[in-house]
């Protein structure tokens, strides 16, 4: 396994729309393992392949503290949405930035697991939010782009200042 580099917003590569995985093979399983290692090391709960500059429809997540419920979504598609909720989100590609985003309260998603087997998951709460957040990444959307133009501008300014101080 290997740690992967997580792209940082506003890197243009984060806006690349991911292509479907054609075959779930050893290459994809290695990517999944590397994504889990990277996500856990970064103390995240979800990671999309787009964030590590691999533009294929692969997502990993684990909402538990003890890393006991790893979930893999290959070629995920949300087939149903219901309700509305607002939750303060963060992102490994936008470190230190958190803001409230409105999303569906419940979702039904279809995907393949790391063995290439199709499954359906009905999710609510944080899991539903995380699924939508990570699937946005596969469409080239970063959560801050769901905020008002004013908030987006403030975040970009904050990130530019932070970048100047780290150089």
From Swiss-Prot:
It is an enzyme of class 3 (hydrolase). Keywords: Hydrolase, Iron, Metal-binding, Protein biosynthesis. Binds 1 Fe(2+) ion. GO terms for biological process: co-translational protein modification; translation. The keyword Iron applies. Belongs to the polypeptide deformylase family. PANTHER family: PEPTIDE DEFORMYLASE. This is Peptide deformylase. It comes from Neisseria gonorrhoeae (strain ATCC 700825 / FA 1090).
């Amino acid at each position: 396994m290997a740690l992967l580099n997580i792209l940082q917003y506003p890197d243009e590569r984060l806006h690349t729309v991911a292509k479907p995985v054609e075959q779930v093979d050893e290459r994809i399983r290695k990517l999944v393992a590397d994504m889990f290692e990277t996500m856990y090391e970064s103390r995240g709960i979800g990671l999309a392949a787009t964030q590590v500059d691999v533009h294929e429809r692969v997502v990993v997540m684990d909402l538990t503290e003890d890393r006991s419920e790893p979930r893999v979504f290959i070629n995920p598609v949300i087939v149903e949405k219901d309700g509305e909720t607002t939750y303060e989100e963060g992102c490994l590609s936008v470190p230190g930035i958190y803001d409230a985003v409105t999303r569906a309260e419940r979702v039904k998603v279809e995907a393949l697991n790391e063995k290439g087997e199709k499954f359906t998951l009905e999710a609510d709460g944080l899991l539903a939010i995380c699924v939508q957040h990570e699937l946005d990444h596969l469409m080239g959307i970063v959560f801050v782009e769901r905020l008002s133009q004013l908030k987006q501008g403030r975040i970009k300014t904050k990130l530019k200042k932070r970048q100047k101080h780290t150089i």
